Amino acid sequence: MYSLIEAQLLGGKLVNRVMASLRRIIQRSLGYFCALNGILDFNTDIGTGNLRRYRVLFMYRLLHNFAVISLTLKFLFDFTDHFKYIESSTLITVNFFTYFTLVFFALLSSMGSCYQWQNRILAVLKELKHQRDLSRHMGYRVPRSKQNSIDYLLFALTVLLILRLSIHLATFTLSARMGFNHPCNCFLPECMIFSMNYLLFAILAEITRCWWSLQSGLKMVLLNRQLSTVAFNLWEIERLHTRFQCLIDLTSEVCSIFRYVTLAYMARNLWSGIVAGYLLVRFVIGNGLQDVELVYLVFSFITCIQPLMLSLLVNSMTSTTGSLVEVTRDILKISHKKSVNLERSIEWLSLQLTWQHTHVTIFGVFRINRSLAFRSASLILVHVLYMVQSDYISITN
């Protein structure tokens, strides 16, 4: 028995099984979290592909979304009642009104996308399940190293969710104990926005897995030169091209469905980066901060740092998705001299992929990748320097 356990550990089978079980548990739990936050009216268990509509979830989604919108508006209107505590601080006023505006926009974009494109989201998930079943039937497998990279991102996303819920609870408790009993606690809207971001992350991760399995099938066709005929290879390349094209179309469909969600995601990341960078400078300098202002700014910093942490995970996933076509074209460069027709078929497939992409875009203008992250960081740095310079001028005068 001990030798069997040792052999499994050495071969990595036990670790792979544990990772797969943990992945299924997390995917199912996050699917329940999405349903609990009124995102969709069907089960979003993407890992198992169990996609079923429930009338109870439909009614719950209506009631939940109405309650979230009502509470968010109440928080915003009640903020004016507490304005007397911070009316002397323009910084806090601008900060909180900007925060509420971005949260409200992200909330409306999430609800609007779910209401308007409910059937399209379900169709995308069903097609991904179909693609996954086809790959399993054909014997295509995702490389273990690549599968682990997505699993690690999923685990990090789960840790971030737990941290986010803990921070919200701790912030509310500390603010109540310190006497700042303002109703500006957007707990439910924040959870709903997080659920929508996870749904986008999960769909992109599933597209990436399906694409990686097709890449493994393409390598099998190009490298397995002895055990297959030319006619079979030509037929297999044609099938692979059809499925590659399907995944490219699904990526475009996802960008169309989530265009307002990704726009709100980008706007909030910019604001969070500016506020977090500015507060770091203010804390280091330590000039001109009142006690009330300091407490509010600390809470703002905690609120702003969470979207930035989430953006690292989503940006990593979108960067991986955007590079799928380029990696596939590199695989097609493998020489194959078995047949002239097969060589031409491979060249034709490469040409078909040349003018297409799997980039995640926002309204077709902004591309979510490392280049956008660099431009956003530059914009954040410029605004932070401008705000610090304005504070310095006001202090010296």
Curated annotation (Swiss-Prot):
It holds the Pfam family 7tm_7. The chain crosses the membrane at residues 57-77, 91-111, 152-172, 187-207, 269-289, 294-314, 376-396. Residues 1-56, 112-151, 208-268, 315-375 are cytoplasmic. It is a multi-pass membrane protein. Disulfide bonds: none annotated. Its main location: membrane. Residues 78-90, 173-186, 290-293, 397 are extracellular. One of its GO terms (cellular component) is axon. Keywords: Cell membrane, Membrane, Receptor, Transducer, Transmembrane, Transmembrane helix. It is found in: Cell membrane. It comes from the Eukaryota. GO terms for molecular function: ligand-gated monoatomic ion channel activity; taste receptor activity. GO terms for biological process: monoatomic ion transmembrane transport; sensory perception of taste; signal transduction. Belongs to the insect chemoreceptor superfamily. Gustatory receptor (GR) family. Gr22e subfamily. Probable gustatory receptor which mediates acceptance or avoidance behavior, depending on its substrates. This is Putative gustatory receptor 85a. It comes from Drosophila melanogaster. The lineage of its organism: Eukaryota, Metazoa, Ecdysozoa, Arthropoda, Hexapoda.
